[in-house]
A protein has these predicted regions:
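Flexible, acidic glycine-rich loops studded with aromatic residues
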Residues: 376-382, 387-392, 398-541
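Bacterial Sec-dependent N-terminal signal peptides
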Residues: 1-23
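Active-site neighborhood of glycoside hydrolase catalytic domains
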Residues: 271-277, 281, 286-393, 397-410
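Soluble non-cytosolic domains of exported or imported proteins
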Residues: 50-57, 113-117, 163-167, 238-242, ...
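Feature activates predominantly on carbohydrate-active enzymes
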Residues: 92-296, 300-306, 311-324, 365, ...
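Contiguous, structured surface segment used for ligand recognition
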Residues: 20-150, 487, 503-537
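Flexible loop/turn segments at secondary-structure boundaries
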Residues: 54-55, 163-165, 191-197, 265-271, ...
Length: 541
């Protein structure tokens, strides 16, 4: 009830927000309104050349879909009095832009074509929120100066627990682009399914991409699998290398880098089912049909394991030009290693103290291989256990304290703590009362309402001397309880907007203002057919 009242107060006070606010999420760094208006229509020309033609084309198609008219793209404005001119200026930062709306036209200047794209996303939101008269839109004159606080602004999608189509993955990328994210973390391998074609190892998709059935409802690691209900329906599929290239190209056109995750040495049961010799026991294994953590992991004592990992990564590197490769490293039980003679021999041979250091040995070998190929690793914060190199980037999920620990050790950090950034968590404290679908976070015990996401401070009171190590923020969507993409959207939105403002507008946030602007953004969700949770809009948290 207390939170409900807080939400009502926040909504009621929206009218008091400064008149300088504009309907843009994430909140711009500065807005200066001036007198006058300009009207744009299907006769307006977007002036773009060279590398700016691509963002101009995407912008024009979006405006056509959302507003019913498509601006003309040309290399000059001609006699147009409502031209939208795009330009770059290397004096600005790579993601910094200036949006200048005057009576005589609109100019977007960015430090790069990517920055211009962000300026166009802001203009897109302004156009949709402005008064329309047929195919004519009237905009207030203003100057917006804007740039992001964090260089890494990401969204993760798990396509393993449940798989989604190419078009649905592209829609997720569109959602990220609307919110000015620049990274798509693509979780591609799991105990419950292997989702990427690796030609050297065809069984990964022939066997590992399909599970025979799926547990119904909530299930935990310690549950007796024989007493759980299952749906009896096979579930699976994978992305061909051609499809992966298509998705990477689509994201790149929207200035989003795709970072693949090949999780290791745990979360590999689908690979073990495909190639049983990779496990300590040698099988038999089957693709996991329930959630939770499996004790079966890659054998760290066999050289064939590392040959397999390197073979997989060789093909992954051909498909993804990203600077980083995510290698997981989370939730790797050590039970099988403790009982494995080969793993114990590896510990003795390498002078390791225990199985935690064996995992570090595993991660170091993979990191060194990727370094030899000119790439760097990201791993979940468990890779800190047993020691890790300073060149590894840590994705802190088990609380912000893990990120602080990594920063103090000298590692770069992406903050994605579950208590703020796990968008599979329930959105209300009483999911049964509010008819929420099955969700993560212990079925509401750790719910994550919009206001909590928005309150996240990635620096978490860390000493300012470590601020430079905190490189960004990411929202994660684990799909155990999301059998279709509409459900994914429902869990992502509108909380993705809060993540966007945390990562872009840090130090410039205002929740009352955000509430006002979110109501405008909601209409863009509606226009694009995005499914979203309405709890916030109904005053429920």
């Amino acid at each position: 009830m207390k939170r409900f009242l807080m939400t009502i107060v926040a909504i009621a006070s929206i009218a008091a927000v400064s008149a300088a606010e504009v309907a843009i999420i994430p909140r711009p760094l500065s807005v200066e309104k001036v007198e006058g208006t300009i009207t744009i229509s299907e006769k307006s020309i977007v002036v773009a050349d060279g590398s700016l033609a691509r963002p101009a084309s995407i912008f024009a198609s979006i405006v056509a879909k959302e507003n019913g008219f498509e601006p003309i793209i040309a290399k000059s404005a001609g006699k147009s009095k409502s031209a939208i001119k795009l330009a770059t200026d290397n004096k600005l930062g790579k993601e910094e832009y200036i949006l200048d709306i005057t009576r005589g036209g609109i100019i977007i200047t960015g430090g790069s074509d990517k920055a211009v794209f962000y300026g166009l996303q802001s203009l897109r939101q302004l156009i949709f929120a402005a008064p329309h008269k047929g195919t004519k839109v009237t905009l207030d004159c203003m100057t917006i100066k804007d740039k992001p606080h964090f260089g890494y602004r990401g969204g993760m999608l798990d396509v393993c627990r449940h798989i989604f189509s190419v078009e649905e993955v592209k829609t997720y990328i569109d959602m990220l682009a609307l919110h000015k994210a620049n990274t798509f973390h693509w979780h591609l391998t799991e105990d419950q399914g292997w989702r990427i074609e690796i030609k050297k190892y065809p069984n990964l998709t022939k066997v590992g991409s399909m599970r025979k059935e799926t547990v119904i409802g909530r299930a935990h690691t310690g549950d007796d699998p024989n007493k759980l209900p299952y749906d009896g329906k096979p579930h699976g599929g994978f992305f061909t290398q051609e499809q992966v290239r298509d998705i990477v190209k689509y994201a790149t056109e929207r200035y989003i880098e795709v970072i693949p995750e090949i999780d290791m040495p745990g979360h590999m049961v689908a690979a073990l089912a495909s190639y049983p010799h990779l496990g300590c026991k040698g099988g038999p294994y089957e693709v996991r049909t329930r959630w939770g953590i499996s004790e079966e992991v890659l054998c760290a004592g066999k050289e064939s394991t590392f040959e397999f990992v390197e073979g997989v990564l060789d093909e992954v590197l051909e498909l993804f030009p990203s600077k980083f490769i995510h290698i997981g490293g989370d939730e790797c039980p050590k039970k099988s290693w403790k009982a494995c003679p080969l793993c114990q021999e590896r510990i003795r041979k390498e002078g390791l103290k225990n199985e935690f250091e064996l995992q570090s040995y595993f991660i170091h070998r993979v990191e060194n291989y990727l370094k030899s190929k000119g790439r760097h690793i990201i791993g979940w914060d468990e890779i800190l256990e047993g020691g890790i190199s300073k060149t590894a980037t840590i994705m802190a999920w088990r609380g912000a304290k893990q990120g602080i620990k990594a920063a103090k050790l000298g590692n770069n950090v992406i903050m994605t703590p579950n208590e703020y950034c796990y968008l599979d968590y329930c959105q209300t404290s009483n999911p049964k009362l509010y008819n929420e679908p099955v969700c993560g976070g212990g079925g509401g015990r750790r719910h994550l309402p919009l206001i909590t996401v928005y309150s996240f401070d990635p620096y978490n009171n860390i000493d300012t001397k470590y601020h430079g190590a905190i490189k960004g923020v990411q929202g994660n969507i684990w799909t155990e309880y999301m059998p279709n993409f509409k459900h994914v959207q429902y869990m992502a939105l509108p909380r993705m907007a809060a993540i966007a403002e945390v990562s872009w507008s840090h130090g410039n946030k205002n929740y009352e203002s955000f509430c006002q602007r979110l109501r405008a953004l909601r209409k863009i969700y509606d226009k694009n057919g995005y499914n979203y949770a309405t709890f916030f809009f109904n005053g429920i948290e």
